[in-house]
């Protein structure tokens, strides 16, 4: 073994006397050039000096057991070893970890992370003009974004404001394509890993592995557990925050974020996004960051209900939440305390917030879920969802008849709703809606085929 070469690996010419072209190493580190079996044959490089594990911290011993690629790049007196896309600098003698890590802010403007963010931002939008324009000069655009973020010369473009009317009227503020890329990088690499650490399991919105169907399954599970313990005689408090996104106070939000994030550069970018709207209240519905900010804003309420009020069966999806309990009077007291909590953050409960018998069920995430006398949990698509889908199908069929969209677009929209409806007890509803869909689309498709 030559001086300056790490124990267990040799990176020069292979062993010519060995049929497998692998250089063997004796237990003392010297080369073994014979063809006999050697227990140290093909030893992978070690990152740590050869010493007993009892002398190492627990975390260090865990890293020692990692398998690293045998190929290392020799550079002067050091080797750089690839590990999950990052570089770890190791000294030749013993692979002592010296570490090369990016700060949270560097993760945001790192070129590879910006490229991944661009790929996420373009999903389902490549046909749009803004996405196509950004993609024409992709490398130049990403390099410019990286430079602007690094030097803090980055600014947000004006929002594109429009209204949507389903499921209810809302004002949406859509940001520019470059800002979408930045926010994807910010959320994926910094905000989501840090902010979601304190979230309870039953916070369902905008998180990997969760969502509407997960929330519905948890509600169903809670109802079954409650029935096994208390029977059908129970109550459910269904709550809703009035104009939630438009009522979030900037100063309170910034304080909550600073309790979890300390990097001043990240906080500069976060403040820039929060203050991008007029006034000191409200965050844009169209921003990706707004989803995480909204989840964080009521994270304290989740812990308050679970830990202070002692409610076992509780769940929240953004600004909609429910509490299940056997005592109606206690739920009334919970409502008062929840109202006081949200008012301290500049919010108010919707007038629809009320307490219902558990057997009457609750409207949550597009379904009406209720408990029967036998303990079965039934989940039905809400009437409003049915009517909205019929109106949407009629509108899409008219656009298809006018030649503005193709049949595949209509089918994809309908299949999306159909998949959602299948999560409930909706067999007969789906059959009726299938018939309605076929009556709108199939005759037109048959007529087009006859023309050709």
Where are these regions (language model features)?
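Active-site-adjacent bridging/hinge elements
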Residues: 17-25, 153-164, 269-277
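C-terminal, surface-exposed recognition/capping segments
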Residues: 1-57
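Ala/Thr-enriched low-complexity intrinsically disordered regions
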Residues: 13, 30, 59, 70-72, ...
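Aromatic (phenylalanine/tyrosine) cluster motif
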Residues: 7, 37, 61, 68, ...
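Right-hand nucleic-acid polymerase module
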Residues: 86, 175, 180, 184, ...
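Conserved polymerase palm-domain catalytic core
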Residues: 141, 148-149, 217-318, 322-339, ...
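Conserved two-metal-ion catalytic palm core of "right-hand" nucleic acid polymerases
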Residues: 54, 66, 74, 83-253, ...
């Amino acid at each position: 073994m030559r001086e300056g070469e790490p124990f267990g690996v040799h990176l020069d010419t292979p062993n010519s006397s060995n049929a497998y072209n692998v250089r063997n190493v004796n237990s003392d580190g010297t080369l073994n050039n014979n063809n006999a079996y050697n227990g140290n044959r093909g030893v992978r490089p070690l990152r740590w000096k050869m010493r007993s594990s009892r002398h190492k911290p627990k975390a260090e011993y865990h890293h020692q057991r990692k398998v690293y690629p045998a190929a290392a790049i020799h550079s002067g007196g050091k080797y750089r070893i690839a590990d999950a896309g990052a570089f770890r600098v190791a000294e030749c003698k013993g692979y002592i970890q010296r570490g090369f890590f990016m700060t949270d802010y560097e993760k945001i403007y790192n070129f590879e992370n910006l490229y991944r963010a661009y790929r996420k931002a373009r999903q389902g939008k490549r046909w749009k003009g803004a996405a196509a324009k950004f993609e024409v000069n992709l490398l130049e655009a990403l390099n410019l974004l990286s430079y602007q973020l690094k030097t803090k010369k980055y600014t947000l473009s004006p929002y594109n404001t429009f209204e949507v009317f389903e499921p209810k009227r809302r004002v949406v503020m859509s940001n520019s394509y470059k800002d979408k890329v930045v926010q994807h990088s910010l959320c994926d690499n910094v905000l989501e890993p840090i902010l979601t650490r304190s979230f309870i399991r039953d916070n369902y919105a905008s998180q990997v592995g969760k969502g509407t169907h997960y929330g519905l399954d948890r509600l169903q599970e809670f109802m079954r557990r409650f029935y096994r313990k208390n029977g059908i005689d129970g109550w459910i408090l269904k709550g809703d925050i009035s104009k939630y996104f438009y009522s979030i106070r900037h100063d309170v939000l910034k304080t909550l974020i600073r309790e979890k994030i300390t990097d001043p550069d990240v906080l500069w970018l976060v403040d820039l996004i929060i203050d991008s709207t007029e006034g000191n209240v409200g965050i844009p519905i169209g921003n990706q960051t707004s989803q995480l900010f909204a989840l964080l804003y009521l994270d304290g309420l989740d812990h308050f209900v679970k830990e202070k009020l002692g409610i076992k069966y509780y769940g929240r999806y953004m600004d909609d939440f429910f509490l299940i309990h056997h005592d109606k009077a206690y739920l009334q007291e919970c409502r008062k305390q929840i109202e006081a909590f949200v008012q301290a953050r500049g919010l108010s409960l919707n007038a629809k917030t009320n307490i219902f018998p558990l057997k009457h069920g609750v409207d949550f995430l597009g379904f009406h879920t209720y408990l029967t006398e036998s303990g079965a949990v039934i989940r039905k698509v809400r009437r409003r969802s049915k009517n909205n889908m019929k109106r949407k199908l009629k509108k899409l069929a008219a656009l298809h008849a006018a030649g503005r969209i193709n049949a595949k677009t209509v089918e994809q929209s309908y299949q999306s709703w159909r998949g959602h409806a299948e999560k409930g007890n909706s067999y007969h509803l789906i059959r009726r809606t299938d018939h309605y869909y076929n009556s709108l689309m199939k005759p037109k498709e048959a007529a087009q085929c006859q023309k050709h």
